[in-house]
């Protein structure tokens, strides 16, 4: 190969943000509605309503004045014209590429854990071997990839509602690539005929023949995985650490060196449909599995690849997905497509696919020392976030309903607010992710659960718990109703934050011709955009746990779910704020138990 070829991450035909690539990838063949725009008068009125409980009266009055000035300004008209023009594309959304560029490609730390998100799946495959599970999963994922290539898997229905699966178009054969002057999202929409397998930091290429049945492919893959697992060859963490550097410039330098020495190998990694990691460890708890997927002493990763399977020696699965393209709801949907189809196959008479080892440049002693330091730096970065796992079998959705509580999410967030106020005497903004896939390229919006009613209840409760709980039935219905209404608004594209983000980005990209609105500098604007408590809930029978770092330096991250079996959560906080989370968890548990015990 001519090493003077332009690297794929610098080619416009591989750049997700190139309008031609976007148009080629995303075709709204199911006529799913586009993400709606709203008049600024509408979303800014909602902004004032949602932000009022979060700021002082003085700051709120200033925000009201700033909103009025903005609505009367030339800048407002210019910004809305830009958004309206972006909304004309029926095969995208006015926000989608902005979201990719500014929410993810501007990540300043390692792509994992900042962008790569791990999801633990509990599978009905007890007793399976690592090779059996890897083969079944890979065959099913390969089949889904083929369907995506043929545009046979573009949407799904739930209770007569159609949801988009557009994110599948950019999750295969893709990768986020760190560059000092701005990250690139590489995607190859030409059909790939191979996957990459990693075991003990040795990379293997498996070319797949589509001529046989899915069962035949699974048998071939199983024999191939057995061969790879039987191979004792191992390498210390090496060039793959370029995906885990703590600076973009360092990652770019290593990537450029690697491209100059072995471009063929690099292209194999990027162009592969997906990666399968065969980990030589046995882990049991969700938290252990999630943390292992991000950092392990043997590393064994190529972070920021679109989608990866991480399978342990005791056949436990974590899906590592690049959040730039794929969020938790999409992972849950993907799991529900393939998990029910998992079954063992008879390998008698089958032939293994021949694994081809990918050849990395030789690592001399100086480079080994350098990579060892990179590994330490990455470990320090990852473990600066401390995580805890909660699993409460005594706190379930049926129990809540039996207490007369209709909306479990509203109740949980009220308890979060009480715990927060008891911990630091503050009521801060909370991010709650809301699925917007009923729109083409809709992704997520967020709701802000604090309201005047919830704030008043929290303060009453913290002052007089017994007296306040005696009047719980008087206060709670309004809190619950508002939470439900905010959720409904966010689901239909009528939230607050995405519209505010769009207005800001329209100005940001045209600030040479648009004066910066004073509204963007108000305390209220900055407060509604902050996420000291960042939360996300995915309730699914297979996707049981996931994790993410705090969004704010002094904040906490809460990945949780409640269903008929339990309440479970992975909570995160940075080391310097550890005591805050410990106190918060204690107060949260006490609050839930006290309220449930009191309610009859």
From Swiss-Prot:
<dbReference type="Pfam" id="PF00755">
    <property type="entry name" value="Carn_acyltransf"/>
</dbReference>
<protein>
    <recommendedName>
        <fullName>Putative acetyltransferase MPN_114</fullName>
        <ecNumber>2.3.1.-</ecNumber>
    </recommendedName>
</protein>
<dbReference type="GO" id="GO:0016746">
    <property type="term" value="F:acyltransferase activity"/>
</dbReference>
<keyword id="KW-0808">Transferase</keyword>
<dbReference type="InterPro" id="IPR000542">
    <property type="entry name" value="Carn_acyl_trans"/>
</dbReference>
<comment type="similarity">
    <text>Belongs to the carnitine/choline acetyltransferase family.</text>
</comment>
<keyword id="KW-0012">Acyltransferase</keyword>
<dbReference type="InterPro" id="IPR023213">
    <property type="entry name" value="CAT-like_dom_sf"/>
</dbReference>
<dbReference type="InterPro" id="IPR042231">
    <property type="entry name" value="Cho/carn_acyl_trans_2"/>
</dbReference>
<feature type="active site" description="Proton acceptor">
    <location>
        <position position="323"/>
    </location>
</feature>
<dbReference type="InterPro" id="IPR039551">
    <property type="entry name" value="Cho/carn_acyl_trans"/>
</dbReference>
<feature type="binding site">
    <location>
        <begin position="396"/>
        <end position="409"/>
    </location>
    <ligand>
        <name>CoA</name>
    </ligand>
</feature>
């Amino acid at each position: 190969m001519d090493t003077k070829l332009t690297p794929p991450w610098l080619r416009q035909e591989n750049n997700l943000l190139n309008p031609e690539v976007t148009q080629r990838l995303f075709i709204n063949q199911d006529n799913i509605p586009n993400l709606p725009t709203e008049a600024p008068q509408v979303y800014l009125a909602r902004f004032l309503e949602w932000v009022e409980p979060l700021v002082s009266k003085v700051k709120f009055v200033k925000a009201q004045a700033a909103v009025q000035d903005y609505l009367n300004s030339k800048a407002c008209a210019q910004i809305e014209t830009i958004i309206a023009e972006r909304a004309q594309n029926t095969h995208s959304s006015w926000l989608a590429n902005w979201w990719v560029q500014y929410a993810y490609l501007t990540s300043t730390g390692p792509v994992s854990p900042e962008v790569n998100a791990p999801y633990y799946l509990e599978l009905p495959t007890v007793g399976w071997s690592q090779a059996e599970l890897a083969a079944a999963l890979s065959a099913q994922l390969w089949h889904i990839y083929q369907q995506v290539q043929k545009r046979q898997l573009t949407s799904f229905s739930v209770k007569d509602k159609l949801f988009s699966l557009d994110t599948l178009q950019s999750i295969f054969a893709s990768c986020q690539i760190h560059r000092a002057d701005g990250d690139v999202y590489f995607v190859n929409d030409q059909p790939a005929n191979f996957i990459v397998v990693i075991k003990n930091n040795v990379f293997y290429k498996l070319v797949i023949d589509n001529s046989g049945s899915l069962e035949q492919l699974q048998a071939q893959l199983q024999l191939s995985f057995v061969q790879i697992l039987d191979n004792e060859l191992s390498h210390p963490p090496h060039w793959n650490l370029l995906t885990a550097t703590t600076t973009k410039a360092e990652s770019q330098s290593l990537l450029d060196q690697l491209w100059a020495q072995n471009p063929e190998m690099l292209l194999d990694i990027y162009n592969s449909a997906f990666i399968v990691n065969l980990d030589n460890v046995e882990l049991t708890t969700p938290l252990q599995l999630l943390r292992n997927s991000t950092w392990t002493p043997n590393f064994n990763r190529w972070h920021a690849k679109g989608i990866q399977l991480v399978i342990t020696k005791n056949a436990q699965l974590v899906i590592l997905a690049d959040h730039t393209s794929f969020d938790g709801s999409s992972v849950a949907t993907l799991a529900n497509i393939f998990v029910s189809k998992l079954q063992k196959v008879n390998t008698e008479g089958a032939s293994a696919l021949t694994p081809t080892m990918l050849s990395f440049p030789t690592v001399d002693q100086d480079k080994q020392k350098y990579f060892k330091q990179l590994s330490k730096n990455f470990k320090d970065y990852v473990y600066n976030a401390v995580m805890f796992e909660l699993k409460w079998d005594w706190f379930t959705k049926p129990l809540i309903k039996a207490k007369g509580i209709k909306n479990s999410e509203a109740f949980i967030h009220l308890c979060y607010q009480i715990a927060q106020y008891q911990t630091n005497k503050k009521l801060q903004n909370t991010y709650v992710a809301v699925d917007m896939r009923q729109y083409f390229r809709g992704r997520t919006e967020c709701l802000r659960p604090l309201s005047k009613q919830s704030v008043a209840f929290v303060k009453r409760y913290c002052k007089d718990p017994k007296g306040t709980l005696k009047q719980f039935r008087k206060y709670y219905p309004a809190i619950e109703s508002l939470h439900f209404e905010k959720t409904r608004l966010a689901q239909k594209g009528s939230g607050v934050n995405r519209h505010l983000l769009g207005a800001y980005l329209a100005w940001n990209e045209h600030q040479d011709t648009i004066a910066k609105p004073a509204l963007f500098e108000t305390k209220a604007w900055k407060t509604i955009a902050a996420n000291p408590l960042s939360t996300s809930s995915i309730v699914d029978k297979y996707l049981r746990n996931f994790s993410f770092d705090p969004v704010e330096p002094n904040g906490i991250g809460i990945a949780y779910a409640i269903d008929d079996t339990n309440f479970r959560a992975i909570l995160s906080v940075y080391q310097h704020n550890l005591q805050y989370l410990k106190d918060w968890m204690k107060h949260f548990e006490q609050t839930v138990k006290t309220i449930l015990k009191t309610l009859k």
